[in-house]
Amino acid sequence: MLIDRLSFNRAYLGHGVGLRQKHFARWLSEKPAVDWVEVISENFFARGGRPLAVLEKVRADLPVVMHGVSLSIGSTDPLNAGYLADLKQLAARFQPAWISDHLCWGSHGSRYGHDLWPLPYTEEALNHVVDRVRAVQDILRRQIVRDVDERRVGANSQRDAFHGAGVMVARAEIGKQSNDRPGHAPMVLRIAD
């Protein structure tokens, strides 16, 4: 995995691990030797319950990063306002170091396929994603990390994933500080191979 740091002011968090439900008991009984934890955002959208209680305890000791799997940034459906409201509320509560999701699509006609479908890296798709990234960042009032998987490059692509993602970052002016999002570090692009 290559991490392309587009910002010199993003603090290095050290080594982290994913916090999954099957690990809750261990997290509560012993504190693993890690510097931060990653949570799947959607697993904590509930308004109460054990997952949030565990995350509260973990967050008291460690920074959290949030990684989503359902933003569907590449979909042609309207952005899911309910999803974004839940994500924004969760971020306000736990103040993650960053929020990430996949550069893909997973919904059509307001139905979720529960998969990460590839985007074609074409001018049309890149322009569409840039507009949606900007809209999401405006709603969340913070910049987001896009997770780009080289294995998920759609048919008819005019660019490879690395170049296409780089174009997207440049066009969305990702990496610039904004008066609208004070104090939030610019986007990091995570590329999985």
Q: Residues of each region from the PLM?
A:
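Boundary/entry segment of secreted carbohydrate-active catalytic domains
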Residues: L2-R26
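Hydrophobic faces of well-ordered beta-strands that scaffold small-molecule active sites
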Residues: L13-L19, D35-V39, V64-H67, A97-D101, ...
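Active-site beta-loop-alpha junctions enriched in small/polar residues
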Residues: R20-K22, I40-E42, V69-S72, H102-C104, ...
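Acidic (Asp/Glu)-rich catalytic clusters
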Residues: W27-P32, G49-M66, G82-A97, R134-I139
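Acidic-and-aromatic substrate-binding clefts and catalytic sites of carbohydrate-active enzymes
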Residues: S41-A53, S72-A81
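Active-site acidic/histidine proton-transfer and metal-coordination neighborhood
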Residues: N80-R146, R152
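Alpha-helix boundary/capping motif
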Residues: V148-R151, S157-G164, I174-R181, A185
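Short, intrinsically disordered C-terminal tails of secreted or membrane-associated proteins
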Residues: P186-A192
